[in-house]
Regions:
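RNA pseudouridine synthases
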Residues: 1-127, 134-135
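Structured core elements
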Residues: 11-12, 63, 129, 141-143, ...
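Pseudouridine synthase
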Residues: 28-36, 80, 137-178
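Residue-level recognition of well-ordered beta-strand positions that form the cores
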Residues: 91, 106, 131, 143-145, ...
Length: 178
């Protein structure tokens, strides 16, 4: 983890791809949360970190941690007001037909995967806007802008479009670029 910003209330780190954000039932160690907490304890500081949000294991990007519970609560409560720009870049299989568009579906978290429905079946409504940056050699470079932030939303929506993210075996993507 690389610390990119720190003040009296928050720490922002750059999480690498392949690292879980937080502990799960099966993975208790070597998460962004545990690594940052170990760093704080080793440095002799008098606080611990509190989780504000998560990124998927296969997503790299910036993560924010609070230094106290009050800050954590405030950031979580107003997260959608504070974070107005949630854009991601991904390489997907196939050359996208459209330059831009929107995917809307209802996502339901199952045990091993997130399922998607075009109709409200009790899942959480999710909306992803996409823009095709470049097409080449059977792949597309995409900019993905989340209107909502559901678990595995981008992964599921790209699969729904028939263009799974490269490296995402769970949702149909190839292992790597050929």
């Amino acid at each position: 983890l690389k610390i990119v910003y720190e003040d009296a209330y928050i720490i922002v780190v750059e999480k690498m791809q392949g690292l879980l954000s937080v502990n799960t039932e099966r993975q208790k160690e070597r998460t962004a949360y545990t690594i940052l907490n170990e760093y704080v304890q080793r440095s002799g500081r008098q606080f611990r970190v509190f989780i504000v949000h998560r990124l998927d294991r296969d997503t790299s990007g910036l993560m924010m941690f609070a230094k106290d519970e009050k800050t954590q609560h405030t950031l979580r409560e107003y997260w959608h007001d504070i974070v107005t720009d949630r854009r991601y870049v991904a390489v997907v299989a196939g050359e996208m037909e459209k330059d831009h568009g929107t995917v809307t579906s209802w996502l339901t978290d199952r045990t091993l995967y997130v399922s998607s429905s075009k109709y409200d079946d009790g899942g959480s409504k999710s909306v992803t806007h996409y823009h095709t940056i470049k097409r080449a050699n059977g792949y597309s470079l995409m900019e993905l802008d989340l209107e909502t932030g559901r678990k595995n939303q981008i992964r599921v929506h790209m699969q729904d479009l028939g263009h799974p993210i490269i490296g995402d075996g769970r949702y149909g993507g190839e292992e790597s670029l050929n």
